[in-house]
Curated annotation (Swiss-Prot):
The gene is spt5. CDD domains: KOW_NusG (cd06091), NGN_Arch (cd09887). One of its GO terms (molecular function) is translation elongation factor activity. The lineage of its organism: Archaea, Thermoproteota, Thermoprotei, Desulfurococcales, Desulfurococcaceae. This is Transcription elongation factor Spt5. The keyword Transcription applies. Stimulates transcription elongation. Keywords: Transcription, Transcription regulation.
Length: 151
């Protein structure tokens, strides 16, 4: 083997909800049979697929042959970039500045408006002062739970 240069990614269609079980069985089978399955990925955002990294498609076939929850015999070949899109979290952090008015879109204060006091990008948190007339308070919440309000 040339150190992963020619390894490919194969998407296996499985029963939705059985991805982790299938991945575990494939890992045990690959270890027992000495198959060259380099990695097994259960994508968090896509149900019904397990992704295998292997040099030889025959190893993928041997690892999945006869498994109960595998729906299709022929796996889909994926490019590295496609796998990275599935695995890498895409978090869009809004650009917030102190003094800006935001709406809280999740959590205990959902639906309330607040004014930004401080933004901590490294921790992914924002400190806000709630603007509700009956409920004046300061809270530190995750930055992905707020959305800027156009004034």
């Amino acid at each position: 083997m040339e150190g992963g240069v020619d390894a490919r990614f194969y998407a296996i269609l499985v029963t939705s909800g059985a991805e982790v079980n299938v991945a575990t069985i494939i890992a045990e089978r690959a270890r027992a049979l000495g198959l060259d399955i380099r990695s097994i990925i259960v994508p968090p955002r896509i149900k019904g697929y397990v992704i295998l990294e292997a040099h030889d498609p025959g190893d993928v076939y041997d690892a999945t042959r006869g498994l109960r929850h595998v729906k299709r015999r022929r796996p889909l070949i994926l490019k590295f970039e496609e796998v990275m899109k599935l695995v890498k979290p895409e978090v869009e952090i809004p650009a917030l500045k102190p003094g800006q008015v935001v709406e809280i879109v999740a959590g205990a204060f959902k639906g309330m408006k607040a004014r930004v006091i401080d933004v901590n990008q490294s921790k992914g948190q924002v400190t806000v002062s709630l603007l509700e007339p009956l409920f004046r308070a300061t809270a530190t919440i995750p930055i992905d739970e707020v959305r800027p309000v156009e004034e």
